[in-house]
């Protein structure tokens, strides 16, 4: 869908750009010549309305030429600078909430062509802890957003009971791994969020996330716990469901590695959601190739209070600002 929109935007910009050039370099000089001839023939100065009647500009040409600068600016900004995205799910809570509208820095990981997403100019690579928008490897039409936890060459081990990550850099190409990266965790505390569980009439299970004061409860809800996770020099909060256990049988098992251990190949990344028990991420479907990277999430520019798949019920202006 995103690539289709980009294709339509590129085509519209090219078509209106051609109209703008044709008008500027072909039709406009002819109109000016006819207007000058009319001025000479009348012997008096003609006003603009009269001159426009003498040499009118076709409506379709005027519309196309006037739209071109706007489309060109939108194309440049959206393709190479910043693109807006909406957060549709709770997988990155508490950092990003359902209903957040974010700005993604498109040039953070390379300047890419807007249609095929081929890198034209390399500008950088994800750093550990970056919040990254990328094309889902199993269906590139979908945009995902997760946190970059593992970089190329990292050995990632996830403890599904303690829900903690161990990272050993420099493990690719059969080399001996370097010392483990300092990954620290604060004490587990109750969070402000409650996850509710219910079933629709058809039997389909549904879930929602709500901010609920610590001294209150919510029907069919479980209060999530949280702690701070520090990956090197990046600290952020993660959420956990106290009673949840990962479905290890659904983990992506890398050939040659034990379950829940992965060595990130060159040019690929290991992504995880901050809402650890509510995130389908690299633990389940593997690595993200560098070619799939879209950009780095840098700011929230608007936020609506809403649940997944429902209409907004309010505006959260306090969330507008940078993302960490």
From Swiss-Prot:
GO terms for biological process: signal peptide processing. Residues 23-58 are cytoplasmic. InterPro entries: LexA/Signal_pep-like_sf, Pept_S26A_signal_pept_1, Pept_S26A_signal_pept_1_CS, Pept_S26A_signal_pept_1_Lys-AS, Pept_S26A_signal_pept_1_Ser-AS, Peptidase_S26, Sign_pep_all-beta_subdom. Keywords: Cell inner membrane, Cell membrane, Hydrolase, Membrane, Protease, Transmembrane, Transmembrane helix. Belongs to the peptidase S26 family. Its main location: membrane. It is a multi-pass membrane protein. This is Signal peptidase I. It holds the Pfam family Peptidase_S26.
């Amino acid at each position: 869908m995103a690539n289709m929109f980009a294709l339509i935007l590129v085509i519209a910009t090219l078509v209106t750009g051609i109209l703008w050039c044709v008008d500027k370099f072909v039709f406009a000089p002819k109109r000016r010549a006819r207007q000058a001839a009319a001025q000479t023939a009348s012997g008096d100065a003609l006003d603009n309305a009269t001159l426009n009647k003498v040499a009118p500009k076709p409506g379709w040409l005027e519309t196309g030429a006037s739209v071109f600068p706007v489309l060109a600016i939108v194309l440049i900004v959206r393709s190479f600078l910043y693109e807006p995205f909406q957060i549709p799910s709770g997988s990155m809570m508490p950092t990003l909430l359902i209903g957040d509208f974010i700005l993604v820095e498109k040039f953070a990981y390379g300047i890419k062509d807007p249609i095929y997403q081929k890198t034209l100019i390399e500008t950088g690579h994800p750093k550990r802890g970056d919040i990254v928008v990328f094309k889902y490897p199993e269906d590139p039409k979908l945009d995902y957003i997760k946190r970059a936890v593992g970089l190329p060459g990292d050995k990632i081990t996830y403890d599904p009971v303690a829900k903690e990550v161990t990272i050993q850099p420099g493990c690719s190409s059969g080399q001996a791994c370097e010392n483990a990266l300092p990954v620290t965790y604060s004490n587990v505390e109750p969070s402000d969020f409650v996850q509710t569980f219910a079933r629709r009439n058809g039997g389909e299970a549904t879930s929602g996330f709500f901010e609920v004061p610590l001294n209150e409860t919510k029907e069919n809800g479980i209060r999530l716990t949280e702690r701070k996770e520090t990956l090197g020099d990046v600290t952020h909060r993660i959420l956990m469901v106290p009673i949840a256990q990962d479905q290890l049988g659904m983990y992506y098992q890398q050939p040659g590695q034990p379950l829940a251990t992965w060595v990130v190949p060159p040019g690929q990344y290991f992504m995880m959601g901050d809402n650890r028990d509510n995130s389908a991420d690299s633990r389940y479907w593997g690595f993200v190739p560098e070619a799939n990277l879209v950009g780095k999430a840098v700011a929230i520019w608007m936020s609506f209070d809403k649940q997944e798949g429902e209409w907004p019920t309010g505006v959260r202006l306090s969330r507008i600002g940078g993302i960490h």
